[in-house]
Every structure is written in structure tokens, then in C-alpha cells.
Amino acid sequence: MASNMVISACETSQPSDLVKTPVSIWASGQPSQGAAESSVPTLSYNIPPTRVPGSPILTPTPDLQHYQLGPARGPETYIVQPGDMLSAIAQKYSVSLPALAQANNIVDVNTLEVGQILTIPYVPPQPTGPAYKIIPDSELIYGPLSTLTDVDAFIRAKAGYLANYSQEVNGEILTAAQIVLLAAQNSSINPRLLLAILEYRSGWLTNPNPDPALDEQPFGFSDAWYHGLYRQLEWAAIHLNSGYYRWRTNLVTDWVLADGSVVPVAPTINAGTAGVQNFFAQLDDYSTWLRDVSPGGFFDTYQVLFGYPFDLAIEPLLPSNLIQPQLLLPFEPGVTWAFTSGPHLAWDAGSPFGALDFAPAETQGCDPSDAWVTAVADGLIVRNYIGSVYQDLDGDGNEGSGWTILYMHIAARGRVQPGAYLHAGDRVGHPSCEGGISSGTHLHIARRFNGEWISAGSPVPFNLGGWVASGSGEEGVGSLKRNDQVLESYNGSIPTNQIHR
């Protein structure tokens, strides 16, 4: 008999005269012995060569306008809805959290009452921000060319503080290169970008004796949780991703800077540049932000380290005719599971609503489960790490190219290992609470294409065995529809959310 208990939730343009040369790129996961060679094709990308010395650097083409600049607005009001957070309301209305709290005499920013009427203060905006493009989209995302840089060799060659840095992460001592790669791969941010920002903010890459005051906060963000290199990189990734995906989906028109300044976003920048602008908005006052995101600022550090970033632009990163390959439901035939969460954060704050959750129907809490999560398609297992398994569907071994599937909260017991080639329906492992924050045993599944997290709803909705996902706009609330059948997500197991192959 199906129970009504809560069982699972995730808490959480190039010069036309450049000749392009195709190269093959591999990541860490290679096919295991016995995998059919024909089933693991090699994917090639056309990469422009190093710029000929003295050849002109062409200005990147502006994007089409993402929005129209409107007239100045005055104060507004907002009625608090269930699930609202003051920080999210502040972000929605482009005001700082302190300014919103002060305007409403709120002492505890973590407490709101449903029905409470908030005054949204009017903050006169600064002039529109720079339209200067800093990096292409493909240099922000952990995309097809992210593996061109040997991070370990690069760090050692620079002989700075990072060359001898290590830190305990999740009970394991990791080198700086391992830490940077882990943060980059998990959040799907280009490691070159993380290294360049780290150098710009702290000098850790080239300076063997940087400011000791930055030891626990190399990006300059002070917080009890985000201390040490790994957590600081996670924090940076959140805000790089947030700027990128909110700009991609036309959810932002202004940046709110650390000093409370409001800056309208130049409507013709690209998403990669938006991510960088948003990152610096978290740390800077207005004059510093202008310096950081203009010519002569962060861009110069990036170019000194890695060359002109638009030489490696893959445009578009997502083709306009992108179609999801055929995917199965991620469990064995005849076994009942529950659809416990509609579209929600694919990875961490800042990522889009790209994930769906499923749980074995009779599981309680974080109890171990003998149910199996199965592969949704053929593909190579390229990586696993504390509850996560990454499957590369084009089989080239590079999780930044083509379609990639993330299976999250997979128990260590029976978990598939990197190098294995799975066919659709093969076993990946058991669902659990391992990895991230989870209130119950379940599977969290998400997709990436060329390293970009893909929203679970439109325009390329998740389609699992004919069940097509849609979202409501509210995190975790959504449905699956197949023909005339509709399942609504519910954080538990009830007849109306049960599903099987």
C-alpha cells in the first residue's frame, strides 16, 4: 500500500581568416576493456590555432538586445507567498537585501509571514553598465574545450602559492589542481575562468607569498561556511552560474552591487560576460565594479594567462535546433517509483531548474534501498564522486561535450565505476541520501549539453520514456505528461505520483 510519508527532496565570433584544425579531446573516463570500440565514438571539434602574432583582434559582435530599457520605476509593494525568501524577493526586484530589510523594519531576514505586505524601495540606478564583452559563453561553462588546459601542470609552471597548496575536502587531502578541477566539473564552470579570477583577486597563481589575510578567503568573500579554497570556488561558481543562466533566460535586467548600487545591465552583452559581471557585483562598490568589468580590468589578467578568450569561442554553444536524445525512465521495468520533485536546481544555487527527483515508492527517510537506478541511454561513465555519477552519451570521454547525464545520490554500494560503458537500462547503482543534502533516499537526475545545464522544462524538456516534464515556475513543483496521463510531483508516495517503466 502506498504511503503518504515524506521520502525525498534535494535541499539544495572568430576572425574569418583563421584556419580551424580538428582535434580530439579526452577527459579522465576512458572506455574499460571489453567496451565495444564502435559504441564509443570520438568527437572532434574545430579549434582555431594560436593567433598569428600581429594579426588584428576583432571586437566580438554584440548580442541582440536581451531586453528594452524602460522608464524609471517608483516604490512597489509585494505580498509574501508561501515559500518566499527575502533574499529571493530582493533579487527579483533588484534591491539589496539590507535595503529591503531596512525599508520594512525586518530584523531577522530569514523570517517572513505569508500575506505580509512588503514595501520595495526605489533605488535610483547608476548609468547602464559596460557593453564590453569579457569572455564568450564557452569560456564560462565547463564546455568542450575546458580540457585544453592541464590544470596541474599550469599551476606548477606558475610557481605561485597554489603550487604547494593542499586542503582537506570531504575527508581527503587534495592538491590545488584537484580542488580547482573538482569545483569546475561539479558546477560546470571552466577551470580557466576560476584560475583567472583567483589570480585577479589574490595573486595565488603567480605570487608565492600572497597576502596572509586572504588565506581562508582568496576571493575576498568573508563567510563562516565559504572558507578555504574549495568553498570559495563553490561560492564563485554559484554567482558565475547565476549571472549566466539568469541572463540566458531573461530573468535579470539589473545588477545589485555590494554597496547597494543598482546598475542596469547593458542589453547586448552575452551570457558569459553576464556571469563575470554578476560575480564582481557580489564584491565591489560601483567604481571598483566598473574597473573590473571594463577594458583594463579582469579581462587583462585572463588574456595574460590564457590568451584572447574569443579565440576559443564555440558559438553557438547550444544549437538552435537542439533535440534531446531518446532517454528511458531511470529504473528497472515493473518497479514502482514516485515522482517526488519537478524541475529544481540542477546542481547548486545559481544553476537552472534542470533536475527531476524520483524515489522508490516504499522507501522511508534515508533507509538503504535495494532498488536500482538504471542508465537512461547508452554512454560512458566518465566520473563519480560522493553520490554522483556522470555519464557521457557521445562516448568521447569528455563530460564537457555533447549530452551528459548526472545521476545524483547514488550509494557507494554497487555504484558503477568510471570507464564502464553502459547501455540503456544497465544498472548505475542504488538510490540513497549520499552526496549533497537530502531528506530522503532518492535519485536526482539532470542533463548538460556542451557543459551547459539544460532546464528540465521548455524549450528542450526532459523526456523520459515519453514522459515529458514541465514546471510551474516554483522550484520543485511540476508534472510529467505522457499522452493523456499526467503525474504531479509530490514529496512522498501517493497513487497520483507513482510511475514505472
Regions found by a protein language model. Give the residues of each.
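Short glycine/threonine/proline-enriched tight-turn/helix- or strand-capping micro-motif at secondary-structure
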Residues: 319-322, 326, 337-375, 407
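Short alpha-helical segments in extracytoplasmic peptidoglycan/chitin-binding modules
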Residues: 80, 84-103, 115, 184, ...
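Catalytic glycan-binding domains that act on GlcNAc-containing polysaccharides
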Residues: 131-290
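Primarily a LysM-type cell-wall glycan-binding module
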Residues: 17, 24-39, 61-98, 116-122, ...
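Zn2+-dependent peptidoglycan hydrolase active-site motif and core
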Residues: 368-418, 439-442, 446
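Acidic, glycine-rich catalytic/binding loops that coordinate metals and/or anionic ligands
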Residues: 325-327, 367, 374, 417-423, ...
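A structural signal for short beta-strand/turn segments enriched in small hydrophobics and glycine
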Residues: 339, 373, 379-381, 419-431
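Non-catalytic cell-wall polysaccharide-engagement segments
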Residues: 13-14, 222-340, 476-501
